[in-house]
């Protein structure tokens, strides 16, 4: 598909499918795909749990803010962000000013199902991950909505179904940029 859209940024909670759907969207549009968490790991030579352990969440968020400033300035990319990206005002500013932001909205039940076996999520290494996910959702959902140009309810949908919903929304909201 041909498009003259600016860069596309995907936000949402952990387990929403940002990376999976982002890769599909990038392929569909013929664009490069970048995952900000993977980018941070490549830049530091360490994984996210290690960064959290050594630098704490504050250290990670500082690294994330630098990465988001750099990555949102790139042209014609699809960028999947980390779940906490919206916690920093400068990240929200970069997301809203540099491209089109798509919020993949997943409820806590969906997130819990998709993250249950994933041990690489430091914020879920707790006896009650449901409570953590609910707390994060309550704080972050309004911030995701604040930056979002498009909101896609993921439900229990498959990645290709979510891709279809995103493409339909892009055609509806930005028809001048979308050509079949």
Curated annotation (Swiss-Prot):
Pathway: Metabolic intermediate biosynthesis; chorismate biosynthesis; chorismate from D-erythrose 4-phosphate and phosphoenolpyruvate: step 5/7
GO biological process: one example: amino acid biosynthetic process
Binding note for cofactor: Binds 1 Mg(2+) ion per subunit.
InterPro entries: P-loop_NTPase (IPR027417), Shikimate/glucono_kinase (IPR031322), Shikimate_kinase/TSH1 (IPR000623), Shikimate_kinase_CS (IPR023000)
Cellular component terms (Gene Ontology): cytosol
Class of enzymatic activity (EC top level): transferase
UniProt entry keywords in alphabetical sequence: Amino-acid biosynthesis, Aromatic amino acid biosynthesis, ATP-binding, Cytoplasm, Kinase, Magnesium, Metal-binding, Nucleotide-binding, Transferase
Pfam families on file: SKI
Binding site for Mg(2+): 19
Binding residue positions for substrate: 37, 61, 83, 140
Lineage: superkingdom: Bacteria
Cofactor(s) of this protein: Mg(2+)
UniProt entry tagged with the keyword Ribonucleoprotein: no
Binding-site positions, ATP: 15-20, 121
EC number: 2.7.1.71
Description of how the protein assembles with itself and partners: Monomer.
Assigned protein family: Belongs to the shikimate kinase family.
HAMAP family associated with the record: Shikimate_kinase
Function: Catalyzes the specific phosphorylation of the 3-hydroxyl group of shikimic acid using ATP as a cosubstrate.
Stated name of the protein: Shikimate kinase
UniProt source species: Psychrobacter sp. (strain PRwf-1)
């Amino acid at each position: 598909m041909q498009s003259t859209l600016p860069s596309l940024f995907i936000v949402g909670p952990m387990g929403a499918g940002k990376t999976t759907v982002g890769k599909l969207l990038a392929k569909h549009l013929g664009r490069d795909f970048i995952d900000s968490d993977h980018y941070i790991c490549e830049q530091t030579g360490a994984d996210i749990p290690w960064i959290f352990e050594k630098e704490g969440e504050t250290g990670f968020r500082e690294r994330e803010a630098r990465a988001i400033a750099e990555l949102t300035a790139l042209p014609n990319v699809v960028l999947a962000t980390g779940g906490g990206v919206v916690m920093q005002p400068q990240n929200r500013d970069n997301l809203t000013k540099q491209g089109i932001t798509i919020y993949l909205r997943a409820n806590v039940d969906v997130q819990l199902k998709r993250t249950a076996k994933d041990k690489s999520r430091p914020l879920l290494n707790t006896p009650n991950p449901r409570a953590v996910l609910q707390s994060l959702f309550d704080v972050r959902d309004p911030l995701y909505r604040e930056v979002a140009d498009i909101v896609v309810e993921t439900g229990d949908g498959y990645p290709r179904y979510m891709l279809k919903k995103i493409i339909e929304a892009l055609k509806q909201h930005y028809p001048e940029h979308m050509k079949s």
